[in-house]
Amino acid sequence: MKISELMEVLNNHVPFHQAESWDNVGLLIGNDKLDITGILTTLDCTDDVVNQAIELNTNTIIAHHPLIFKGVKRIVEDGYGSIIRKLIQNNINLIALHTNLDVNPKGVNRMLADQIGLENISMINTNSSYYYKVQTFIPKNYIEDFKDSLNELGLAKEGNYEYCFFESEGKGQFKPVGDASPYIGKLDSIEYVDEIKLEFMIKDNELEITKRAILDNHPYETPVFDFIKMNKESEYGLGIIGQLNQTMTLDEFSEYAKKQLNIPSVRYTGQHDSPIKKVAIIGGSGIGFEYKASQLGADVFVTGDIKHHDALDAKIQNVNLLDINHYSEYVMKEGLKELLEKWLFKYENQFPIYASEINTDPFKYK
């Protein structure tokens, strides 16, 4: 599998266009023509993480936080420059999945919510993208192979269902002329073929991969296919809100979250005996959504990087906050590894996928 193919799979499942405009996602360092020897997931790409990739003979790192984010003015043998140089010198590709993974329904916030054990979950702040209906015409005796090829690319899937197609039978006709090299039929002779009209749905970020799949796998030289924009929309968005299976006090919940997330410390605002049942969570830095979460009925808003004045404002307005530190997003390492194993199952014998064990938290706790 080449890096370019991996990028298509990632864009299919974690669309790059869903990242914030200020973000820097995608292939940041590398060559999309290289074959993959292994994948290492990490929260941050540090020198220790690069060394681990080298030891594992893994030439692809997928990080949540972009190594190249603010303007890089020089690449020298210290600071970020030394990491970038080491990546290039060792032919290691670096891919960033940042805010596009944050807003993904299966992304960082869902991983945190699952770790805490939230149920009946929904998104705090939703966006949407459009679906398209695809229709094309396939010779009847080729239809199953064609559907298999689409399924292998992750197309025609809806939630937990695969092979989501509609078929209708018909008869096609054509006459090969000139330099045609027909899969069926003879030159200068009208050919009638039993065909299947195949229809299925895709998301807007799957348009290009679907077009390529049809052109690469359809038996005809010039296949006919249509993309029809539908009213149906798919949702993605920032933050998760859900319920605990039992009510706790705020003090109990803070200890519970600390244990479930395996983090060294937490801090909270609010009365220690406040009842907590409904929980909203945004990993990383989610301040700015605490009041919307409260309006949605959340008893506590869980995030990281909470500043003094934001905490004071929330306390005055009786909005409970729980600060789980930015590094709590480390759960994405194992979470993304599991997602990649599902998305890349047909390549599972070609290369290994690892979740980095390197702790990249810059803080020490006492």
Swiss-Prot record:
A divalent metal cation 1 binds at H64, D102, E329. Disulfide bonds: none annotated. One of its GO terms (cellular component) is cytoplasm. Homohexamer. It comes from the Bacteria. This is GTP cyclohydrolase 1 type 2 homolog. Pfam families: DUF34_NIF3. Belongs to the GTP cyclohydrolase I type 2/NIF3 family. A divalent metal cation 2 binds at H65, H326, E329. It comes from Staphylococcus epidermidis (strain ATCC 35984 / DSM 28319 / BCRC 17069 / CCUG 31568 / BM 3577 / RP62A). One of its GO terms (molecular function) is metal ion binding. Keywords: Metal-binding. InterPro entries: DUF34/NIF3, DUF34/NIF3_bac, DUF34/NIF3_sf, N-reg_PII/ATP_PRibTrfase_C.
